[in-house]
């Protein structure tokens, strides 16, 4: 009896091991639409084989339960599945297990299980069959579903769910990368506004352009290396250029090379020790607002050997003192002007009170602009109404009426223009163009970022 129990336990433990390794689901697939599974064990007092056991099951139950529960008929119609038998021989006896899948209802399955226990002979040997249990396959499936669902949920919980900010940042990053263009023969990384913008910002690398794009600045272009590309040199002759470099040694070297080979108008730098690609929007805006005219930087760096940041600190300290110096003497100059001073006399004190280069130019323009503005008043009213640009000869006769957008191209082709009147913004680029054409007067609505002009050219704005 002990031997029998040991063998049966060995068989059952092997089956449980297979179930744990995943055979339970493969068994489920084999059973198909099975609802129940009958598990039984048997013992035969002799050596028998698997076909002997199967034959005894079919032979000794035939006609026992009637035609409706005949095993052969049930198997043909698929209401019971393939009967599985495992046998083990030991000490002249045979032990084993029987598995019968059933698609019958629970009552019919129980009757069929009881019928198996009526088998008392297998082959030539006496035998005894005992039903261990009837398993509800659907319950097993439900258990499997629960366990598998736990595993899937744990896997899902382990995955990091991105936050809303990360998602939006990814989308913005993709859009910025799409906005990035390649400019010139060298295919330099640039913002989408570089091809047509009057002013550009020259930075060091692709990452700098992307960071500026991130904060809405779309007119940046990168030099991509320490050697300044020919495209940058060419652009510097046509546009207003601001060099915006990193606040390290590399940024200083690139800045020096830019100032030597390109026509740079302004210089801005990232805070000391920082790179343009890592700046916040606030830091970028502050750096660009603190830009310094290139002529001043060249003088300080190359002639005096001072650093850019020393110049910035000096400008900031002067800026704190400057309002007290400018606001007080100005009323005295205004009061003294109408009484006894001639226009020539008025210009001299103005140059003393206003020391910066830009402020020296303004009194010169103001002293003559009022009468000259009246000379062009008729043309100003006309361009305000019609939205065109007028090209005048020396006798103030209109020699051409053109759209404002064609003004630059026309001035490059013509050499007989004495004055230009248009309802638009006077930029550094336009001034450079008209100076090459020999124009003496340029009259516009206002001026923007004008840092240099020829001595022979007079600029008049509508507000003067």
From Swiss-Prot:
InterPro entries: DnaG_primase, Primase_DnaG_arc, TOPRIM_DnaG/twinkle, TOPRIM_dom. Residues 315-333 have a biased composition (Basic and acidic residues). Binds two Mg(2+) per subunit. This is DNA primase DnaG. Belongs to the archaeal DnaG primase family. HAMAP family: DNA_primase_DnaG_arc. Forms a ternary complex with MCM helicase and DNA. Component of the archaeal exosome complex. GO terms for cellular component: cytoplasm; DNA-directed RNA polymerase complex; exosome (RNase complex); primosome complex. Mg(2+) 1 binds at residues 204, 246. It catalyses: ssDNA + n NTP = ssDNA/pppN(pN)n-1 hybrid + (n-1) diphosphate. RNA polymerase that catalyzes the synthesis of short RNA molecules used as primers for DNA polymerase during DNA replication. Also part of the exosome, which is a complex involved in RNA degradation. Acts as a poly(A)-binding protein that enhances the interaction between heteromeric, adenine-rich transcripts and the exosome.
